[in-house]
Regions:
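Extended beta-strand/beta-hairpin segments
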Residues: 1-39, 49-130
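Alpha-helical metal-binding/catalytic segments enriched in His/Glu/Asp
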Residues: 44-45
Length: 130
């Protein structure tokens, strides 16, 4: 799998065998927490689609997911994500089903129905405690 940082607010995930790599379009670009969130969303979507394709006996070697996002304020955060599924070999009559399958990604569902967050400050460990 290869994650490519396309811009400060866009990534691309390509499937494939071998180790996962993270690449950038330029040396100045760094893998930000926003890229990480989008990578999780794209990887989950790619995984769900690959599993469906295997089950349906469809080739998925050319499947890729791009995720873009934009920010909103008060407070500053990601306001929306746009997922673009690129799958040139997918037959036209399977596109609607593939889109439904993509919507089953657990990461996407978690974002749509956010969990409760709890932040705790833990006490420092006692000196000499083992």
């Amino acid at each position: 799998m290869k994650i490519t940082l396309l811009a400060s607010e866009r990534i691309r995930v390509d499937g494939g065998a071998g180790p996962m790599t993270i690449e950038a379009e330029s040396a100045e670009m760094s893998y930000s927490p926003y890229h990480m969130l989008a990578s999780g969303l794209a990887t989950c979507t790619l995984s769900v689609l690959h599993a469906w394709a295997t089950n349906a006996k469809l080739p998925a070697d050319d499947l890729a997911i791009e995720v873009g996002w934009s920010f909103v304020e008060d407070p500053h955060r990601v306001g929306n994500y746009a997922l673009d599924i690129e799958w040139p070999s997918l037959p036209e009559n399977r596109r609607t089903a593939a889109q439904r399958v993509a919507d089953l990604c657990t990461v996407k569902l978690t974002m749509k129905h956010p969990p409760e967050f709890v932040t705790r400050m833990n006490a420092p460990a006692e000196a000499g405690a083992a």
